């Protein structure tokens, strides 16, 4: 019988079964939390992959719609490629684990997290994070440091570990913390302008719970853990390394002290050519090894400059932001544009406003079924001056787009205030670090230019870190550029407003961050963010008073909910006819609110009138001007409103006897009619003679009033 090991996290049971499933995997296990169950399988190749200069770790997060009792939409009716949310979850699992593998380990490692059952009170991504760490610890793969993961919410001023669905809906913070028992490894957050001190307290609150989960994983590891494989670590031939360093170290060092990037890169390119000329004969098959040595030499020099000389490659102070320029409204036909430049990083963001029917439909394991605001991020090869095929967005592009989207989401106006679907596209035109944060800035500029009444402008900043070997010295860098990102120990991205933080994402290349480092980074990021916001304010201080003349206009009206069927009609016949006649887009909400969107105001007004006519209450005793639509031998049918017809019986057509209806009216005639009855089947009975009589009486009364 399989033994299930369990612990308690936030008052709920976390269970692990290490022997029930995945017998042929290096480690196959089930991990459950409440009714959420995730299958974890971890495997590694027997030998290192040849010809690469990176660690090939692959995290796959597989959502199965049967986990929530759904059948996939579309024609195929099975799961296809991972959803954006699944990709984001996979990236989040990867980040805290990758730095904890041995340096030089180049075996392929794959961890597959398959979501089998979802209880909406217990998030499957958090369960998968803990399961991935534990599976690697139990396996023979050389990974020995458990990582605990929790979600943290903030409700009524109180922190909550792994908030349930009700608490998540009320929470002003959606924070994920991953940590070993000693240090924080990774943080992701979306927040409603949470101040820095509260954000720091939330991270530490989550860290304390992560420690307990990491200790629990250690217990499971002791009981079920396999003997670890001896890793075959990549190492450059010592003689080759000594020769390359001796030949190139001083030249590279001189080059790294050149402040101008173009000039520095030109010198470094010349050094590469000299290296090839020098070592092409003796080490013809070791080009990748030479490149690895050169990379490590550059890294050593840049880190030495920062730690020992307190000097950055581009000459800036540690807390200095690169030069900033902002521009809006430069694409004439776009609904809103923002061009944000920071140093050699440049991002153009374009806003498109659409109807509420343009929302993105989501088909995943969560409760959210549509998205009205979306942000997409493109990173073409030309942004770094390179040549490569242009394909669809990769995981990195999806991740960066989601981060910028998260930073602005709490600032987007509600549907009732601004009834548009909003799509932002950030095009990276030039990249020298921190493009995701430049996307936040560019998006803010574009939204303001488009006339979107966002709550407050937001900006983003990427912070870096370099540490000594023993971690005793820590130097925090503001607004890191490319080299500082490549050779540094941390990428700490913070987005927010002048009031507080709206998004965080940080990960490290070392074994975690100290509490002191996290606190200082948040404080310095705030200072930089306020500086950037002031620069942006100088460009466009507030949103435009109106949306672009090229953007569609939205008109809103409300009808009784029981009249919705009259507007839609059988099989959508009525609403489709209105759309065809007027060229508008129509969205109807369950509460009877109707949104009519059109680039042509006349078309919108026509559609609104038709809907008003369709839904206006017909009152007994009221007189209407109607059009004769059909004649029978017993009377005439008259349309008094769009789609509303009544019968004028032949006896009600005139004061005298009528032998033929055609003697009084013809099809197409406009006549006054009075509603004399609406029967219990909703049929409307009309009278022409009563309408004439009442009209004549009204005219006489008006004449009498004038005489007096």
From Swiss-Prot:
Cofactor dependence: Mg(2+)
Report any one BP term from Gene Ontology: mRNA catabolic process
Which positions bind Mg(2+)? Answer: 485, 491
Transmembrane segments in this chain: where?
none
Reaction(s) the record says it catalyses: RNA(n+1) + phosphate = RNA(n) + a ribonucleoside 5'-diphosphate
As recorded in UniProt, its EC number(s) are 2.7.7.8
InterPro entries, per database record: ExoRNase_PH_dom1 (IPR001247), ExoRNase_PH_dom2 (IPR015847), ExoRNase_PH_dom2_sf (IPR036345), KH_dom (IPR004087), KH_dom_type_1 (IPR004088), KH_dom_type_1_sf (IPR036612), NA-bd_OB-fold (IPR012340), PNPase (IPR012162)
Class in the EC hierarchy, top level? transferase
Can you give the residue ranges of the S1 motif domain? 621-689
Magnesium as a keyword of this entry, yes or no, is: yes
Q: Where is the KH domain?
A: 552-611
Q: Domain of life of the organism in this record?
A: Bacteria
* Cellular component annotations (GO), alphabetically ordered: cytosol
> Which Gene Ontology molecular-function terms are recorded?
3'-5'-RNA exonuclease activity; magnesium ion binding; polyribonucleotide nucleotidyltransferase activity; RNA binding
Cellular compartments annotated: Cytoplasm
Instruction: Cite the residue spans of the region called Disordered.
Output: 689-708
- Quote the Pfam families the UniProt record gives: KH_1 (PF00013), PNPase (PF03726), RNase_PH (PF01138), RNase_PH_C (PF03725), S1 (PF00575)
Q: Please name the SMART domains in this protein's record.
A: KH (SM00322), S1 (SM00316)
Q: Which keywords appear in this protein's UniProt record, sorted alphabetically?
A: Cytoplasm, Magnesium, Metal-binding, Nucleotidyltransferase, RNA-binding, Transferase
**Could you tell me which NCBIfam families the record lists for this protein?**
polynuc_phos, PRK11824.1
Give the family from UniProt: Belongs to the polyribonucleotide nucleotidyltransferase family.
Q: Which HAMAP family does this one have?
A: PNPase
Alphabetized PANTHER family for the sequence:
POLYRIBONUCLEOTIDE NUCLEOTIDYLTRANSFERASE, POLYRIBONUCLEOTIDE NUCLEOTIDYLTRANSFERASE 1, MITOCHONDRIAL
Q: What does this protein do?
A: Involved in mRNA degradation. Catalyzes the phosphorolysis of single-stranded polyribonucleotides processively in the 3'- to 5'-direction.
Name under which the protein is recorded: Polyribonucleotide nucleotidyltransferase
Q: Which organism is it from?
A: Clostridium kluyveri (strain ATCC 8527 / DSM 555 / NBRC 12016 / NCIMB 10680 / K1)
């Amino acid at each position: 019988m399989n033994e299930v090991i369990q612990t308690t996290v936030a008052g709920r049971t976390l269970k692990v079964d290490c022997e029930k499933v995945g017998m042929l995997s290096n480690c196959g296990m089930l991990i459950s939390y409440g009714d959420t169950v995730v299958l974890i399988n971890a495997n590694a190749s027997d030998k290192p992959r040849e010809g690469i200069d990176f660690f090939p770790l692959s995290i796959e997060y597989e959502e199965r719609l049967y986990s929530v009792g759904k059948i996939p939409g579309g024609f195929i009716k099975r799961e296809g490629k991972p959803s954006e949310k699944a990709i984001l979850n996979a990236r989040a699992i990867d980040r805290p684990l990758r730095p904890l593998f041995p340096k030089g380990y180049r075996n392929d490692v794959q961890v597959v997290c398959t979501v089998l059952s979802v209880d909406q009170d217990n998030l499957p991504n958090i369960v998968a994070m803990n399961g991935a760490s534990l599976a690697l610890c139990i396996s023979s793969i050389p990974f020995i440091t458990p990582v605990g993961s929790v979600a943290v919410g903030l409700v009524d001023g109180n922190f909550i570990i792994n908030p349930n669905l009700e608490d998540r809906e009320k929470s002003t913070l959606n924070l994920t913390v991953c940590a070993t028992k000693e240090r924080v490894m990774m943080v992701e957050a979306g927040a409603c302008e949470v101040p820095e001190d509260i954000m720091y307290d939330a991270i530490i609150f989550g860290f304390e719970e992560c420690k307990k989960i990491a200790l629990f994983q250690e217990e499971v590891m002791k009981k079920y853990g396999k003997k670890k494989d001896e890793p075959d670590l990549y190492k450059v031939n010592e003689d080759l390394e000594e020769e390359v360093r001796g030949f190139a170290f001083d030249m590279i060092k001189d080059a790294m002290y050149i402040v101008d990037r173009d000039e520095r890169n030109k010198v470094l390119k010349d050094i590469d050519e000299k290296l090839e000329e020098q070592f092409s004969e003796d080490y013809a098959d070791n080009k990748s090894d030479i490149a690895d040595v050169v990379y490590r030499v550059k890294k050593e020099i840049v880190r030495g400059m920062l730690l020992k000389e307190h000097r950055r490659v581009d000459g800036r102070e540690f807390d200095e932001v690169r030069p900033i320029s902002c521009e809006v409204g430069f694409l004439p036909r776009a609904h809103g544009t923002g061009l944000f430049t920071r140093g050699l990083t440049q991002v153009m963001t374009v806003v498109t406003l659409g109807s509420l029917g343009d929302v993105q439909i989501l088909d995943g394991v969560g409760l959210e079924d549509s998205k009205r605001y979306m942000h997409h991020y493109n990173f073409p090869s030309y942004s770094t001056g390179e040549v490569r095929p242009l394909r669809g967005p990769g995981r990195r592009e999806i991740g960066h787009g989601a981060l910028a989207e998260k930073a602005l989401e709490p600032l987007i106006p509600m549907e009732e205030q601004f009834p548009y679907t909003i799509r932002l596209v950030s095009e990276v035109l030039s990249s020298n670090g921190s493009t995701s944060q430049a996307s936040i800035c560019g998006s803010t500029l574009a939204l303001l230019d488009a006339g979107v009444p966002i709550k407050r402008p937001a900006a983003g900043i990427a912070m870096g870190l370099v540490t000594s070997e023993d971690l005793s010295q820590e130097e925090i860098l503001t607004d890191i550029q490319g080299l500082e990102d490549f050779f540094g120990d941390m990428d700490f991205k913070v987005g927010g407003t002048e009031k507080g933080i709206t998004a965080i994402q940080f990960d490290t290349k070392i074994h975690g961050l100290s509490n002191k480092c996290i606190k200082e980074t948040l404080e310095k990021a705030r200072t930089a963010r306020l500086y950037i916001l002031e620069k942006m304010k100088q460009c466009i201080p507030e949103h435009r008073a109106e949306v672009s003349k090229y953007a569609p206009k939205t008109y809103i009206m409300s009808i009784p909910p029981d009249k919705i069927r009259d507007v839609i009609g059988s099989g959508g016949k009525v609403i489709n006819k209105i759309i065809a006649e007027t060229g508008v887009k129509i969205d109807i909400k369950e509460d009877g609110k109707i949104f009519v969107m059109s680039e042509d105001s006349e078309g919108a007004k026509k559609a609104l009138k038709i809907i008003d006519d369709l839904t206006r209450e017909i009152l007994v005793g009221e007189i209407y001007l109607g059009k004769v639509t059909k004649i029978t031998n017993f009377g005439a049918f008259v349309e008094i409103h769009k789609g509303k017809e009544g019968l004028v019986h032949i006896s009600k057509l005139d004061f005298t006897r009528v032998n033929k209806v055609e003697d009084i009216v013809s099809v197409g005639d406009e006549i006054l009619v009075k509603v004399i009855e609406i029967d219990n089947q909703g049929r409307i009975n009309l009278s022409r003679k009563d309408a004439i009589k009442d009209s004549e009486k009204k005219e006489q009364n008006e004449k009498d009033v004038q005489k007096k």
